[in-house]
Amino acid sequence: MAGLVSLWIAIASPINALDDYLLAAHMIQHFILMSIAPPLIVLGAPTVPLLRGIPRWFRVVLRPFFRARWLHRVVRFFLHPLTAWLLMNIAYLGWHVPAAFELTFRSEAIHQFEHACFFLTSVAFWWVVLAPWPARRVWPRWAVIPYLLSADVLNTVLSAILAFSGRVIYPSYLHAERISTLTPLQDQIAAGAEMWVLNSIVFLVPAVVLTLKMLSPRSLQGLSPSLKAN
């Protein structure tokens, strides 16, 4: 439920109305679509109970579809850690390129497609991190740490560009109606700071928690002597 509520906040609350006027509000929207709603939805994904709750006759109808090898291959491809990492970061960086970003102001359909790209690729990204039951990890658990840290590096680069460029990168915000006391450049600096701090928290906190868990005595007991020495 929390995931659906956060998704509603991103696309149907006043934040959605402000994104044409304030880049800072727009980046909050992107943050919710990529870093709040997806992990919450993955954590609450009732996959098995939902399937078991389907009427028996309907399960019989769906069984050939869910057992299709091509479907399993497609799901495995998109939920593979490397694929999920690349898709999420390509969407994140690609849509923030000025030429692509400006297209979202010219077409509502493109704007919604951008949001769909952010959300769906982020669901795959966080699925790898959280691995909700009955999912099985493709990579060892420790690999989640560089998986998250490398994503944070790219986030830091993009955030720093917005915060320290010294000029307004997205022309549409130069001409947007001013609904706050912030100048367009100040608005962009605030947006970059938001992205930097909020996304870094979301990436770094689970990486640190996982690191501490793996370094705990209980976890170390399960390692071979050679790994402990390293």
Q: Model features per residue range: what roles?
A:
Residues M1-N230:
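Alpha-helical membrane segments of multi-pass proteins
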